A protein has these predicted regions:
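N- and C-terminal low-complexity/disordered segments
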Residues: 2-4, 18-115
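Bacterial N-terminal signal peptides
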Residues: 7-15
């Protein structure tokens, strides 16, 4: 009986979990985070956001200061557009619907260092 109980306990413990781990960031995102951590802290803090936009996963890098535009990249690190920022504050005009149509917002990383 003890052997049967031990076998059942071992079987239960060694069963694979049904929970799935979240998908890992692309390697280039991790490289960008490492690079951003080497820079001086931004004000506002540097951050990377993931969204779904026009049927694809995209990564949004908010503007940091003044007239610097934001950057929106696809999952292969190709530049999609600049949704905001720049001289007029409304980006390059190539994705003016981004803020209205984006979905599945996920914060990938935010710099926790203070300036």
């Amino acid at each position: 009986m003890n052997k049967l109980m031990a076998l059942l306990i071992f079987s239960f413990i060694s069963m694979p979990s049904c929970a799935t781990s979240p998908p890992a960031n692309p390697a280039w995102i991790n490289a960008r985070i490492a690079q951003m951590q080497k820079e001086h802290p931004g004000n506002p803090p540097l951050s990377i956001w993931q969204y779904r936009y026009k049927g694809q996963t995209v990564y949004y890098f908010p503007p940091q200061c003044c007239d610097i535009p934001s950057t929106l990249l696809d999952a292969n690190q190709n530049r999609v557009c600049s949704p905001d920022g720049g001289m007029a504050g409304d980006g390059d005009g190539k994705c003016s619907d981004f803020f209205k149509t984006r979905t599945e917002e996920k914060l990938i990383w935010r710099d926790s260092r203070s300036r």
